[in-house]
Amino acid sequence: MTNIRKTHPLLKIINSSFIDLPTPSNLSSWWNFGSLLGVCLAVQILTGLFLAMHYTSDTTTAFNSVAHICRDVNYGWMLRYLHANGASMFFICLYMHVGRGLYYGSYMYSETWNIGIILLFMVMATAFMGYVLPWGQMSFWGATVITNLLSAIPYIGTDLVQWIWGGFSVDKATLTRFFAFHFLFPFIVSALVMVHLLFLHETGSNNPTGIPSDSDMIPFHPYYTIKDILGMLIMLTALSALVLFFPDLLGDPDNYMPANPLNTPPHIKPEWYFLFAYAILRSIPNKLGGVLALVLSILVLAIIPMLHTSKQRSMMFRPLSQCLFWLLVSVLLTLTWIGGQPVEYPYVTIGQVASILYFLILLIFMPLVGMVENYLLKW
């Protein structure tokens, strides 16, 4: 008799995706981040669901409802900090996942890559709207500053901003709609994740060498299920340590003050995972130019497959490209640091140099070095 997991209409989809899936035999730990992102999404949806049961999306009660969750709800503090720090873990895994794709040439699966970029934008939008919900000082002013950027769009900008606000300033209507969208988006993200996996399973996984692995495949279960479970345990241990010992490490103290439209905080800055993009935005002294640079800092990933000049897919055997890749990582870390600093000399200059370097490396240096490596290998 054939196993039920291979015949049942629903089980056979799960079977072909997570059990009998033929997988390259040499995947490193960098391939763990996909499953870790799935765990992060599940944690965020579950904690978010329980938080939404106690949260009120009204300007007069939002801040107090979060305080009520932390003080009066059973394990409410834990739910709140799991959700807030879970977002940080989500972005750590996201950036590692994208970095893996860049390093090993996974972007050559263009459908999977493009859905991934849409997912990145969606998760960033969700996180931004979630940061507004506690209605602290940084929530309010972050919402005001970031939504105001849309006013840089010629002709329709001002109308667009007022349409998003639901009035002439960030107020009750804004908070209510942000809560509605923040609740909705993770479910759209879940659907897109399915599409992401669908496209991935059309081609099969890439591997560290970048060489087709059709001749050497192993079943996903038990080899990679056990490997993924180890990764999950490590990540959940790190998240638990963060939540239980340093819950406010990555947050902003200003957000413990209720939103006050009459008092601007001295330094308005987003959560740490947006600081690199914020630094790029601030490094251009023109409003529209800054907004374009901000969007392009992520959208640039979409043209990476077109700029692939090397005859080899992965960077595993390309030391010059490896140097450039790690330079890019250091530039991004520099931008993250600059994004959290005040707008004054020398931070402004460092931010401008790092922003220019970021785009130069991705758009010009990497394709050039790929061609140089081809020449050196007489290809």
Curated annotation (Swiss-Prot):
On whether Transmembrane helix is a keyword of this UniProt record, the answer is yes
What compartments host this protein?
Answer: Mitochondrion inner membrane
Q: How is the cofactor bound?
A: Binds 2 heme b groups non-covalently.
Q: What does this protein do?
A: Component of the ubiquinol-cytochrome c reductase complex (complex III or cytochrome b-c1 complex) that is part of the mitochondrial respiratory chain. The b-c1 complex mediates electron transfer from ubiquinol to cytochrome c. Contributes to the generation of a proton gradient across the mitochondrial membrane that is then used for ATP synthesis.
What's an example Gene Ontology biological process for this entry?
A: mitochondrial electron transport, ubiquinol to cytochrome c
Recorded hits in CDD domains, A to Z, give: cytochrome_b_C, Cytochrome_b_N
InterPro entries on file: Cyt_b/b6_C, Cyt_b/b6_C_sf, Cyt_b/b6_N, Cytb/b6-like_sf, Cytochrome_b, Cytochrome_b_C_euk/bac, Cytochrome_b_N_euk/bac, Di-haem_cyt_TM
Residues bound to heme b b566 are H97, H196
Oligomeric form and interacting partners:
The cytochrome bc1 complex contains 11 subunits: 3 respiratory subunits (MT-CYB, CYC1 and UQCRFS1), 2 core proteins (UQCRC1 and UQCRC2) and 6 low-molecular weight proteins (UQCRH/QCR6, UQCRB/QCR7, UQCRQ/QCR8, UQCR10/QCR9, UQCR11/QCR10 and a cleavage product of UQCRFS1). This cytochrome bc1 complex then forms a dimer.
**Record GO terms (molecular function):** metal ion binding; ubiquinol-cytochrome-c reductase activity
List positions binding heme b b562.
H83, H182
Spell out the note in the miscellaneous section. Heme 1 (or BL or b562) is low-potential and absorbs at about 562 nm, and heme 2 (or BH or b566) is high-potential and absorbs at about 566 nm.
Q: Which residues cross the membrane?
A: 33-53, 77-98, 113-133, 178-198, 226-246, 288-308, 320-340, 347-367
Extract one GO cellular component term from the record. Answer: respiratory chain complex III
Give the UniProt family note.
Answer: Belongs to the cytochrome b family.
Q: How does it sit in the membrane?
A: Multi-pass membrane protein
Keyword Iron attributed: yes
Q: What is this protein called?
A: Cytochrome b
What is any Pfam family matched here?
Answer: Cytochrom_B_C
Keywords (A to Z) from UniProt? Electron transport, Heme, Iron, Membrane, Metal-binding, Mitochondrion, Mitochondrion inner membrane, Respiratory chain, Transmembrane, Transmembrane helix, Transport, Ubiquinone
Q: Where does a ubiquinone bind?
A: H201
- Where does this protein come from, organism-wise? Trachops cirrhosus
Q: Which cofactor does it need?
A: heme b
